Amino acid sequence: MRSCLLLVGCVGLALCAGCDSGNQAYHEVPKGARVKDQPHQHEEGPHGGHLVELGEEEYHAEVVLDPKTSRITLYVLDSSAKKAAPIDAKEIKLELTIGAQPKSFSAKAVADKGDPPNKSSRFEVADNPEIKANIKDEEDLKGSVTAAIAGKTYTGKIVHEH
């Protein structure tokens, strides 16, 4: 009998300690209202590189490092970060932090397959001794990408999120 009373007491206590929804208000959403998509982070670009947002996701730059050759390739992508976005520029500025100092590099246009004449979606920094000596993997890439696209200058930071 004593155990039965103890059991009833414990169950009653558990029911009293439940969630209190008294502080939560219900907000009805008007019919036809749409929820705005939240900004999201892209993990990897179509070439397996790190994505850099240019503007308010108007464009993206994909940064790809070939550790064997120390070549850095930048791909200009559209707002979806999936399709090439060929631009008129002959170069893109790549600023990297090397030895705690910012260093500027010029990535030259190298037309990619499918790029129209006089436009490029691919830019490269190749055979650079500073990059060869200091950039060993993607984690060493810290800095920014600056590109002139359709008369507007876009700059995006190379950020590694862990």
Task: List the predicted regions and their residue ranges.
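Intrinsically disordered, low-complexity terminal tails/loops enriched in metal-binding residues
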Residues: 10, 17-162
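Sec-dependent bacterial lipoprotein signal peptides
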Residues: 1-17
